[in-house]
């Protein structure tokens, strides 16, 4: 198991954030329990990493959504695909609040997850927004 798996489980838990925010951490714990039941015992640091991502996105959701609204030019935020919105929140959280994670890694992970869980255009859409933020990261750090 690696950080990709931890991110994927954080993504799955956060996907329900718009529907039942109070259950998001419970969902994450259930996902980890499934992995353990499959005989895949995760290192505690990966479990902690995914918990921190979920808690961080929940805490900073308003700010992350503001950035998405600003950069999703021509898109109605409410009509954005939930997968795309969730992946953007997760990657933006890493980019803005986890300086220990290289920005290209956060972008690549979001794009790879979009290829699996998103629609055909999701990887391109996500890469475009995150690429812009990466190019102007100093501005976004100042605002955060």
Swiss-Prot record:
Keyword presence, RNA-binding: yes
InterPro entries attached to this UniProt entry: NusB-like_sf (IPR035926), NusB_fam (IPR011605), NusB_RsmB_TIM44 (IPR006027)
Keyword terms, alphabetized: RNA-binding, Transcription, Transcription antitermination, Transcription regulation
Entry-linked SUPFAM superfamilies: NusB-like
This protein's record includes keyword Transcription: yes
Biological process per Gene Ontology, one example term: DNA-templated transcription termination
Assigned GO CC terms: cytosol
Lineage top rank: taxon: Bacteria
GO molecular function: RNA binding
CDD domains tied to this protein: Terminator_NusB
Biological role stated in the UniProt entry: Involved in transcription antitermination. Required for transcription of ribosomal RNA (rRNA) genes. Binds specifically to the boxA antiterminator sequence of the ribosomal RNA (rrn) operons.
Family: Belongs to the NusB family.
HAMAP family: NusB (MF_00073)
Protein name in UniProt: Transcription antitermination protein NusB
């Amino acid at each position: 198991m690696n950080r990709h798996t931890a991110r994927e489980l954080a993504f799955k838990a956060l996907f329900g954030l718009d529907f039942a925010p109070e259950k998001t951490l419970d969902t994450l714990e259930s996902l980890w329990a499934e992995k353990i039941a499959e005989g895949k015992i995760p290192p505690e640091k990966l479990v902690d990493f995914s918990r921190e991502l979920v808690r961080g996105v929940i805490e900073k959701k308003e700010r992350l959504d503001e950035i998405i609204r600003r950069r999703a030019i021509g898109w109605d935020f409410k009509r954005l695909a939930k997968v795309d919105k969730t992946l953007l929140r997760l990657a933006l959280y890493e980019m803005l609040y986890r300086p220990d994670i290289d920005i290209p890694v956060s972008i690549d992970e979001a794009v790879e997850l979009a290829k699996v869980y998103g629609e055909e255009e999701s990887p391109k859409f996500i890469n475009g927004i995150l690429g812009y933020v990466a190019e102007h990261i100093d501005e976004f750090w100042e605002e955060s």
